[in-house]
A protein has these predicted regions:
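Short cysteine-rich clusters marking metal-coordination/redox-active sites
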Residues: 149-152, 168
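Short functional micro-motifs and their immediate structural scaffolds
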Residues: 155-159, 173-176
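Acidic, low-complexity, intrinsically disordered interaction modules
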Residues: 186-192, 201
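Long, charged N-terminal interaction/targeting segments
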Residues: 1-133, 202, 210-221
Length: 221
């Protein structure tokens, strides 16, 4: 997502650090989305309705069985990014933005999610608004995924050549080349506001440290 506003970086960190209590309310499986039993998936969709897979070009009928049965778009992303310490933290921070900005949860829905060039790409349909906090947070998480192993979800990664993807040192065995950990950096973007070209930078370190701390505390594999 690339529609950004002038929100400050510390807000990302503050929003992310408030999610631990909320996470406890959601009975999510301790593995990947792919292994959910039907009841668990329905619970997940109820708690995070904005991840329900809806084809925006065809229909927005949330009650149609084809959508309630097929689930979400998130089954298409690498297993490592579906681990609880990453995916649950991401979804709670996105939900927090939606709630704090007063948007209706039913008006936001996902149309696609995938790995691309070693980072996450998510497509959402959202209401037109002057405040792009949701898009800001989406961009931060899309870029942050590139600092967690696409295979197991651990932090501290190197980037493979050929098919570009992040791998931790433990998963590097099948990859040719020397393991060189990449430092977490800011993401620079250029946007247009009121016909004026504006360059902005989002610091990913606060979010990275939040997810890394949760990983260290849970270490679910």
């Amino acid at each position: 997502m690339y529609f950004l506003n002038s929100r400050t970086v510390p807000e990302f960190a503050m929003r992310a650090t408030r999610i631990s209590a909320e996470m406890a309310k959601c009975s999510l499986a301790h593995d990947t989305f792919i292994t959910y039993r039907p009841l668990e998936k329905l619970e997940l969709l109820e708690y995070f309705p904005f991840i329900k897979h809806v084809d925006a070009e065809r229909t927005t009928d949330w009650e149609h069985p084809v959508f309630s049965e097929t689930g979400t778009c998130l089954e298409c992303i690498p297993d490592g990014w579906q681990k609880p310490w990453f995916i649950e933290t991401m979804l709670m921070s996105l939900k927090s933005v939606i709630q704090e900005d007063g948007m209706a949860m039913k008006d936001i829905y996902m149309t696609g999610a995938k790995e691309k060039y070693g980072s996450l790409r998510m497509d959402f349909v959202t209401p037109v608004t002057k405040d792009h906090a949701f898009s800001d947070m989406c961009l931060a998480w899309e870029e942050l995924a590139g600092y967690f192993c696409c295979q197991c979800g651990k932090p501290h990664v190197s980037i493979s050549r050929g098919w570009i993807c992040p791998y931790c040192k433990d998963c590097w065995d099948d990859i040719n080349g020397e393991f060189k950990e990449i430092p977490v950096e800011s993401v620079s973007i250029t946007t247009w506001e009121n016909d004026e070209k504006i360059k902005r930078t989002i610091d990913l370190v606060p979010l990275y440290e939040t997810v890394e701390k949760i990983w260290e505390e849970t270490c679910v594999y």
